[in-house]
């Protein structure tokens, strides 16, 4: 009897969770991630875009949603669309302090695949300036050298 009650409560909780209004960053991020895992990429993009439009989120949170959209589109090899989200993310986070992430080299790669080498170099230089608060950004130095010496298509 108790297990039946617990099962019903769990079902009600899952139903509520799937229908609750999205109001916080975590709600948008988690819901979009779940949809992305189910390969419902269009729905995941829509959910994140709803969060981006919500001005109760901080610029850094909205930038993170753009970054997640960019990563998803990069996986789908939609490089130009991916870089549009990265552009928006960097614009929103321009004056914010955010930690180094190992995925930044993939971001730069997306710019190269989209034929935007100059923008890749500008972004890399901007990231390198962030060493003042996070020394891990120094790990992008070899990438900068590679960009400077690189000729042709990626």
PLM region descriptions:
Residues 22-57:
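Alpha-helical segment of the N-proximal tetratricopeptide repeat
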Residues 55, 93, 130-135:
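Alpha-helical junction/boundary sensor with strong preference for TPR arrays
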Residues 22-23, 60, 98-100:
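Residue signature of alpha-solenoid helical repeat architecture, marking inter-repeat boundaries
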């Amino acid at each position: 009897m108790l297990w039946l009650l617990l099962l019903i409560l769990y079902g009600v909780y899952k139903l509520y969770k799937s229908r609750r209004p999205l109001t916080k960053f975590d709600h948008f991020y988690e819901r979009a991630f779940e949809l992305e895992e189910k390969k419902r990429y269009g729905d995941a993009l829509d959910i994140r875009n709803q969060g981006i439009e919500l001005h109760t989120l901080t610029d850094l949170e909205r930038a993170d949603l753009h970054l997640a959209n960019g990563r998803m589109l990069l996986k789908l090899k939609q490089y130009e669309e991916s870089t549009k989200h990265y552009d928006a993310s960097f614009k929103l986070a321009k004056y914010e302090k955010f930690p180094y992430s190992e995925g930044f080299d993939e971001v730069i790669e997306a710019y190269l695949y989209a034929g935007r080498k100059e923008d890749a170099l500008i972004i890399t230089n901007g990231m390198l300036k962030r060493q003042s608060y996070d020394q891990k950004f120094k790990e992008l130095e070899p990438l900068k050298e590679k960009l400077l010496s690189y000729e042709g298509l990626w």
